[in-house]
């Protein structure tokens, strides 16, 4: 995988219709899409037309260069992200090849209208979440999309394993790219990458949290798991420290999630494992405690809505407890550049929204997405104690 934007975006190569692209790998969404060669860019604040360079895409997809593209009639793409970015366009089919696995006639979106903060490298995105999150709608005009009336289709990974091309499992080991050479870790489709990881595995169920708008049945959407709680330490600690140590060591503070009214002592909370989100999002109270644990301490900036910290501060150790085991984020990943002379905490408040375990935490953990078994597996990784193959 390729790491760009100071280790905040993770890309993988894909060939579509004979054209090669770098795409964002996102476990928090499902649609595969590319910017079309004739797309229009719109300002992220005013939504007024701007030069296409402002969307900062990599090379766009060119229909005329593909011998295998077919248009999907009477269908359109209407996709919005929590960041406020919006994509509208057409739907088509073409041959996708990723990781040596080829899927012919994969459905995907061609973006004609983009409100997008790009990275200058990626030409689009491939979502690896469940098909229930796909955003294809009836009609050629995406502006006529009706919320809750999307036509669900198989994302790329679904077609890979449903065609028996690979096992229904993939895994990710993200890296910060400490040497600045673009090495963003590894992704394995159909198994686990051959990299060093900790001695203990844990496995937990993926929690179905969505509600089907037609049947009202619970369904899988995101890779949501139950976390036991969170821990915070002013001192660096062992990567594989048990949760008991977090509770007994007076220099470590277990942090609770939202209160369960039936069990007020519970610290459990559902959290989404999302490679497409840079930061970790928890309750505002936990985010404040993490910010204040920096030395010197951070603070909440009312103007930006973020917990900011001095750029020279020493980060704490922040851990997530899953199935009784704490997985710590590398403290070096908790301090992010937020602008000139401005740094932010890698753990931010969700303002009563979703709890998300993003790249800041994922960089220290091998994450296994076992879709076939409906489970996720985790193993700790030593803090960059090995080198990537060139």
Please report, for each region that a protein language model flagged, where it lies by residue.
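Short hydrophobic beta-strand that contains or immediately precedes a catalytic carboxylate
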Residues: 14-16, 22-26, 32-34, 125-126, ...
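Conserved beta-strand elements of beta-rich interaction domains across eukaryotes
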Residues: 30, 39, 113-115, 131-133, ...
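Aspartic protease catalytic domain
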Residues: 113, 312-390
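Extracytoplasmic, non-cytosolic globular domains
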Residues: 28, 186-195, 201, 205-207, ...
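Signature of the N-terminal lobe/flap region of pepsin-like aspartyl proteases
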Residues: 4-121, 293, 315, 323-324
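N-terminal zymogen propeptides
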Residues: 1-8, 50, 138, 388-390
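Short strand-coil-strand connectors
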Residues: 15-19, 97-104, 168, 190, ...
């Amino acid at each position: 995988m390729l790491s760009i934007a100071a280790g905040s975006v993770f890309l993988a190569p894909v060939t579509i219709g004979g054209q090669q692209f770098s795409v964002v790998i996102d476990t928090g969404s499902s649609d595969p899409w590319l910017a079309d060669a004739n797309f229009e860019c719109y300002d992220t604040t005013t939504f007024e037309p701007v030069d296409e360079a402002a969307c900062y895409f990599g090379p766009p997809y060119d229909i005329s260069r593909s011998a295998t593209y077919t248009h999907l009639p009477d269908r359109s793409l209407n996709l919005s992200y929590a960041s406020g970015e919006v994509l509208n366009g057409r739907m088509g089919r073409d041959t996708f090849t990723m990781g040596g696995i080829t899927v012919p006639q994969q459905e995907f979106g061609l973006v004609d209208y983009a409100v997008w903060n790009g990275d200058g490298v990626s030409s689009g995105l491939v979502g690896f979440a469940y098909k229930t999150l796909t955003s294809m709608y009836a009609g050629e005009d995406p502006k006529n999309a009706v919320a809750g009336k999307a036509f669900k289709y198989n994302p790329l990974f679904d077609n890979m394993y449903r065609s028996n091309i690979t096992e229904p499992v993939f895994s990710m080991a993200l890296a910060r790219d400490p040497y600045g050479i673009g090495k963003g870790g590894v992704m394995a489709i159909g198994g686990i990458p051959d990299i060093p990881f900790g001695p203990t595995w844990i496995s937990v169920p993926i929690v179905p949290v969505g509600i089907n708008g037609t049947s009202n049945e619970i369904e899988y959407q995101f890779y949501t798991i139950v976390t036991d709680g969170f821990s915070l330490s002013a001192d660096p600690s062992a990567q594989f420290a048990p949760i008991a140590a977090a509770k007994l060591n007076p220099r470590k503070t277990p942090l609770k999630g939202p209160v369960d009214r039936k069990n007020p002592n519970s610290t459990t909370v559902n959290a989404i494992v999302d490679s497409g989100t840079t930061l970790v999002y928890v309750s505002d109270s936990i985010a404040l405690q993490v910010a204040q644990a920096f030395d010197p301490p951070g603070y909440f900036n009312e103007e930006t809505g973020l917990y900011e910290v001095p750029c020279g501060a020493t980060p704490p150790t922040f851990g997530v407890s899953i199935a009784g085991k704490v997985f710590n984020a590398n403290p070096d990943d908790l301090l992010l550049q937020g602008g000139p002379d401005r740094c932010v905490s890698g753990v931010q408040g969700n303002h009563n929204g979703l709890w998300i375990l993003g790249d800041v935490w994922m960089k220290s953990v091998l994450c296994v997405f076992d879709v076939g078994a409906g489970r996720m597996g985790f193993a700790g990784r030593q803090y960059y104690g090995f080198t990537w193959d060139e």
